Structures are given as C-alpha cells and as structure tokens.
C-alpha cells in the first residue's frame, strides 16, 4: 500500500470530496509542496486514503493577513478559521497556503 503524502482531519473529508474545501493552511514542516504536485490524501486519524489532489498554487500568509476568501476556501467563517489555525499551531504566525483540486 502506498503511503499518503498529506493528511486532513476526518471532519474535512466530505468538504474536500465535494469541492467545498479547496485550500489547506500548514506550518513550515509542510511548506515543501509545489504547484503541480499530485498528492495522495489520507485521514489524520487512521491514515486511510480517501482521494488524490493536485496542488494548484502555493503562497504564504500570517494570522493577521487571513481573509474572508481564505475562510471561504476552507468552508468556514474567518473567525472559525483563525481559531482553528491558532489551536492547531499555537504561538505560530507564519503559514503556507496550499490550494488544490481533487482529481
């Protein structure tokens, strides 16, 4: 079985598959992905594969430069997005936006 290249919390699986979540915001440890990369996607909880995505763009962002557009691409409100990012990456301010589409 092939390993997954990137994982998402299971709660995001349906939004990714339906095209409602089209970005992910990660810390420096996952800043190596590049436009055009094709990635196997698994669930964080059990590493079970659920789709393949293609990276369509990458950029950097800070907590204070997150926008409503980022929130829309994450399928949540801006307030929710800032809280989720702060909870996952406490004390960090520099992040990497990975835009993607399901293949």
Curated annotation (Swiss-Prot):
<dbReference type="GO" id="GO:0005829">
    <property type="term" value="C:cytosol"/>
</dbReference>
<feature type="active site" description="Proton acceptor">
    <location>
        <position position="21"/>
    </location>
</feature>
<dbReference type="InterPro" id="IPR007374">
    <property type="entry name" value="ASCH_domain"/>
</dbReference>
<dbReference type="Pfam" id="PF04266">
    <property type="entry name" value="ASCH"/>
</dbReference>
<dbReference type="GO" id="GO:0016813">
    <property type="term" value="F:hydrolase activity, acting on carbon-nitrogen (but not peptide) bonds, in linear amidines"/>
</dbReference>
<comment type="function">
    <text>Catalyzes the hydrolysis of N(4)-acetylcytidine (ac4C).</text>
</comment>
<dbReference type="InterPro" id="IPR008314">
    <property type="entry name" value="AC4CH"/>
</dbReference>
<dbReference type="InterPro" id="IPR015947">
    <property type="entry name" value="PUA-like_sf"/>
</dbReference>
<feature type="active site" description="Nucleophile">
    <location>
        <position position="24"/>
    </location>
</feature>
<keyword id="KW-0378">Hydrolase</keyword>
<dbReference type="GO" id="GO:0106251">
    <property type="term" value="F:N4-acetylcytidine amidohydrolase activity"/>
</dbReference>
<comment type="similarity">
    <text>Belongs to the N(4)-acetylcytidine amidohydrolase family.</text>
</comment>
<protein>
    <recommendedName>
        <fullName>N(4)-acetylcytidine amidohydrolase</fullName>
        <ecNumber>3.5.1.135</ecNumber>
    </recommendedName>
</protein>
<feature type="active site" description="Proton donor">
    <location>
        <position position="74"/>
    </location>
</feature>
<feature type="domain" description="ASCH">
    <location>
        <begin position="6"/>
        <end position="101"/>
    </location>
</feature>
